[in-house]
Amino acid sequence: MSEGESQTVLSSGSDPKVESSSSAPGLTSVSPPVTSTTSAASPEEEEESEDESEILEESPCGRWQKRREEVNQRNVPGIDSAYLAMDTEEGVEVVWNEVQFSERKNYKLQEEKVRAVFDNLIQLEHLNIVKFHKYWADIKENKARVIFITEYMSSGSLKQFLKKTKKNHKTMNEKAWKRWCTQILSALSYLHSCDPPIIHGNLTCDTIFIQHNGLIKIGSVAPDTINNHVKTCREEQKNLHFFAPEYGEVTNVTTAVDIYSFGMCALEMAVLEIQGNGESSYVPQEAISSAIQLLEDPLQREFIQKCLQSEPARRPTARELLFHPALFEVPSLKLLAAHCIVGHQHMIPENALEEITKNMDTSAVLAEIPAGPGREPVQTLYSQSPALELDKFLEDVRNGIYPLTAFGLPRPQQPQQEEVTSPVVPPSVKTPTPEPAEVETRKVVLMQCNIESVEEGVKHHLTLLLKLEDKLNRHLSCDLMPNENIPELAAELVQLGFISEADQSRLTSLLEETLNKFNFARSSTLNSAAVTVSS
């Protein structure tokens, strides 16, 4: 079975060119994108650019290509080096992270733990968390390394945005603050709902990224499992005031440490900057207390103080904070409808909104709140919700800017039941297991199948075009024997990672239907048949 893929739809906008940022363990940190200029590049600059794009090595599957250009990870614990890389399947840039183990035997002692932890992290799927794509081990004679691929964030950190806002003598918008807090808490609630809970452990304004459209993403998690057994040593942490008081005092921290860090982020977002002690980056408790007193909204002040309780057990959970009066709002009918549309977008034609609104009377009443005691009726006209604004709102909901937090939040799949934050494991002498094939989870929204005769009565040629829910086209072809077992063929496509298991029965039905039509057409002196099935 051969395959070719193409990205048919580009993203609606590119991320802004912002300064570089530091990064948390395991997250894709940001290297400063080069600002374009009108002057022609010198031969030296062109040569340097070519050197940076040179491919140094590939992943075992051939999908990920490591470039020479390094990504600035600053002092990220556990990450020895990070490079820009290319995802050849989807045509996007990613980050190639490397963790060097000082000796091969050190990796052997940790192998089972490392695999269990990374298998968990790959399952994480949340719009407000930097995506963790893939990992594998590279074991040589006397050394070993673990390589993992993460999403590349071309936008800047929240810290940079806050600095720029303060530099321009602006204040923080309350609505923006609520929107950012909601997105961060939605991601933390997702991590903490795992069984066992996943603790981020390094949440600061430097490890939170903001895109041009207001989308917030927190850095993906780098497990402590790798931090104490790697070549690099943990250096003195900056931003110490973001770390809960119990850090270093107890062996096993809880999700409450993330709540403390979030509270400090929420405070910094509200006041733009917490003043440190002179040239030192150290922020004393007095400066934190002074910053809290600057908050005018008593609800906002109470919200942050709850997060910064010195006793971990007294801090609320991420889920509880989403319902705090400082943040919670009853979701509007517009937001509920938008989430319903986004959740069923594979069933709705792409131009449905345009078709519905093009012949609509804009002066007609869309919705009405009837009059009540001492209250005039309120009408909403179609003209108050232009199609372009609705399109943008749907795109924002689709991207995760307005998570629906009043209901049950999505929970991650957990294939392993291993604690992801504890580095303590018993030695293992098991041999490495072969790397499993990558499982396809994306839904196929359109299937097209064609069968043509190659050698009469001997073999046919099958062509499949699959359109996935993220607009990716997958083109597959193979020779088909007259006595081919169709269910086995569909099962093989699942096993090879071309389609998800959920689409196996649909594809089996499509193939059988097409083959029956082909045989009927062949008996009618025709030599090909085609059928299209759309979900």
UniProtKB/Swiss-Prot annotation:
Gene3D superfamilies: Phosphorylase Kinase, domain 1 (3.30.200.20), Transferase(Phosphotransferase) domain 1 (1.10.510.10)
Cited CDD domains: PK_NRBP1
Main location: cytoplasm
Keyword Transport carried by entry: no
Comp. bias regions, Polar residues: 1-26
Keywords carried by this UniProt record: Acetylation, Cell projection, Cytoplasm, Membrane, Phosphoprotein
Stretches the record annotates as Disordered: 1-70, 409-437
Domain Protein kinase: 68-327
Subcellular locations according to the entry: Cytoplasm, Cell cortex; Endomembrane system; Cell projection, Lamellipodium
Modification type N-acetylserine: residues: 2
Disulfide bonds: none
Any one GO BP annotation for this protein: endoplasmic reticulum to Golgi vesicle-mediated transport
Biased composition (Acidic residues): 43-57
Span of the signal peptide: none
A GO-annotated cellular component: lamellipodium
Superkingdom of the source species: Eukaryota
Biased composition (Low complexity): 27-42, 414-432
Location of Phosphoserine modifications: 2
Subunit structure: Homodimer. Binds to MLF1, recruiting a serine kinase which phosphorylates both itself and MLF1. Phosphorylated MLF1 binds to YWHAZ and is retained in the cytoplasm. Interacts with ELOC/TCEB1, ELOB/TCEB2, TSC22D2 and TSC22D4. Interacts with the Elongin BC E3 ubiquitin ligase complex via its interaction with ELOB/TCEB2 and ELOC/TCEB1. Interacts with SALL4.
Family: Belongs to the protein kinase superfamily. Ser/Thr protein kinase family.
Domain notes: The protein kinase domain is predicted to be catalytically inactive.
Role according to the record: Required for embryonic development. Plays a role in intestinal epithelial cell fate and proliferation, thereby involved in the architectural development of the intestine potentially via the regulation of Wnt-responsive genes. May play a role in subcellular trafficking between the endoplasmic reticulum and Golgi apparatus through interactions with the Rho-type GTPases.
UniProt name for this protein: Nuclear receptor-binding protein
Organism name: Pongo abelii (Sumatran orangutan)
